[in-house]
Amino acid sequence: MGLVTGRNANDEIWNAIEAKADNHSTYMSQSPADYPDSEDSRMTYLGVGTGLSFQLAAHHSVGYWPVPVFIWEPPKASHVSRPANELSGIRQEASLGVTLLLWQEDANTNDGSTIIEKLFAFFDAHPDIPEAIIVTFDGAATRDLNQTPGYVDTFKQSNIPTMPDSMVALLVSRSDRVDRLIRPYAVEQTENVDKNTTEYDITKLWNFFWEKNNGEGPGSFEAYYQEQQKAAGIQPRAFLGFMSAQWWQTQLPDFWKTISNKGPGEFKPTPYIPVRWTTWQVRQFDNAPLLGYLHRPIDVKLADAHGKPLKTAQQVQALKAGWQQAVDTLPTGETPKRIFYDTTGDRAWVAPINQALAQSGPSAPSLDDVKEGYDIGRRIGNTGISSPLVQIGLGLIASYHEGGASATIHHRPNGTATIVMVSPPTHKQPDVNPFR
């Protein structure tokens, strides 16, 4: 996991929040001396934070295997490049030399919770997915670059950002699928592979990937992408990222004609597992730290069919029912020890949450307890569309270090509240901090 806000990452953020111990003010400095004093340095900080966030998560993905990536950013002006166009640069900033990325989906949106919905729908729709990366970026510098409609940049008036840089990258895996679809068929071979060791299927996959990703001419992804832009009425521009998973998979039938598929058992290649993993790739997967478990999101409608907010008493009842549904996603008998939420843009919505939790029994966390209720809009600042993943990231850190499940609840632009639970791993490596 790579959680970055401002200059801090992962448990640096959590430790600062805990040290501040104030649910009404930010841990972040309010001194201009602690922030970039020029546009160049501002962009440098943005690039460093982006690369660090992605590196902390993606370097644990399995090398030489194309990992699908979801990347979300705030809204942009029509002439600004889409988020997927940044994947190549982010990979380079993160120094991920043997990591292959697939553009699974991207979005410019005001609703960061959709990335969690898309992730779960993706795993449901594709039973051969072993792992995927989800990424959100936001902040004053990002919105300035994106020329986000309605955003007014104030950097020239004050270098203390109205929105801190906030980047979150999560590597989400399904070990049950690796155990069932990959581990029994893994092939024993050397780790000393490069583009010339073409006797191995893993090398053939590497070479075919780059041939297709960097290809030019009528049958290339670049040509396909340009045609797609024209069809959508968009001024064609060069694509500098990674090819889409959808297009890549249309190329695989030709690739499968070239592989040997030698190894134990009857392995059948699939769109997301195009060749057998090697035993050392399986070890890479096994050695990645398990930070916790992400539970299925529960949506709670707080508005009627016409978008009009429900009355407070109705919101309380809806949240109480949704809370119980979310608790039911946890292992039997487990209840969350803390809750992360965000009152940015709507301080009043804390009232129905408070009442719903109070009516849910003594085991529910209290927003009034500084060690149980975490308003990240106050404790950090406006993290925009990154807020849902910031909450999840902090919940993972808190649960890992202090035990117990953590709840996150995000009030979305469509009048829905989405509750996501995270729970700690059952076994932790002693004397290892996986957030560093």
Describe these PLM feature segments.
Residues M1-Y400, S406-R436:
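Conserved "HGTGT" condensation-loop signature of ketosynthase/thiolase-family condensing enzymes
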